[in-house]
Amino acid sequence: LKMANYDPLTGLPNRDLFYTTLQMGLTQAALRDWQLAVVTIGLNDFKNINLTWGHLMGDKVLAEFSQRLSNCLNVSDTLGRMDGDELALILMIRKGQAGPRQMVDRIREVLRDPFKLHGHDTPMTASYGIALYPDDGAEAHRLIKHANTAMGLAKQAGKDTYRFYTAQMNVEVMARQELETALRDAVRKQAFEVYYQPKIGLADGRICGVEALLRWHRPGHAAVSPAVFVPLLESLGLISRVGQWVIDRVCSQIAQWQRSGLGSLQVAVNVSAQQICEGDLVNDIERSLKAHQLDPHLLEVELTEGSLMENTPHTVSSLLTLRDIGVKISIDDFGTGY
């Protein structure tokens, strides 16, 4: 019976038992005129832990995270594991008792102690979504759905953030789903553009290089900012595919400039951490250079300092390989916290 109702890794109630407990809690809250809160909790960057350190270490982090949360709960509260790195919490709030905001602040505080990963202190944060009974719903499935909606928007707002559910969020979620659909269609049709921004030397005022900038004009809408669609490409797992297209398009453009007698301009291409970790960046670049018969020194790979710190061994290995074949490497946002 315990195996059927409890998660074997964390020892917490599983999804089915959590739903049953929530239904009972809602009945009790209605009878006693209490407030009830459902809080969904998602670890940020948990996928990177699995990619960098392996799933066994990821399981260890999740188990310790669950234990830390359990230690700061009241007797009447229930913590369960819903799926993957997502936990959920039932808070029974009696009159005069501290509300969900205070509990989330306590959880955030216990997370501030870093986790030990192979001897390294690794900070972790989570995102939280909060739905309240009776304001946001009276059924278990509706409260969990609304808490998940709020958590999704908390993740978009930044790490270590929480959001209370509001009806307006449904409009925002619908808009995001429409944006995702349009973006998937753009990837399928390769409906992006690459703009080229010249780099001007201060000493002589001459063009000393070019930076490639990815742009997307969504049909029927204003141009979408890269600050919006690039993170969305990453969350949809499409950034490597688009990044490969950009690299090939840039190499094609460099070759065209050479044929037109414009000389040999070095072009910088921005690369995301996910493109390095999950894609095949080195082979993508080598293939495009060969296809367009380009000297590798005409291509510059630019990544942020934060990207460099994700999955560091693989990232460094890829960058060293690119450097060895002649591709220039540059770091953007240097000195921003690492």
Task: Identify what each model region corresponds to.
Residues 51, 90-95, 112, 133-134, ...:
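Residue-level recognition of strand-loop junctions within catalytic nucleotide-signaling folds
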Residues 21, 175-232, 270, 331:
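Active-site core of bacterial EAL-family cyclic-dinucleotide phosphodiesterase domains
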Residues 47, 84, 283-338:
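The catalytic core of metal-dependent phosphodiesterases that act on cyclic dinucleotides
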Residues 28, 71-76, 109-121, 153, ...:
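Short catalytic/binding micro-motifs of nucleotide second-messenger systems
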Residues 80-82, 98, 111-127, 155, ...:
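Catalytic core regions of nucleotide second-messenger enzymes
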Residues 220, 241, 245-271, 283, ...:
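Helix C-cap/alpha-to-beta connector motif
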Residues 79, 106, 110, 116, ...:
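Cyclic nucleotide signaling catalytic output domains
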Residues 1-5, 9-37, 44-74, 80-89, ...:
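Conserved long alpha-helical elements within nucleotide-processing catalytic cores of c-di-GMP signaling
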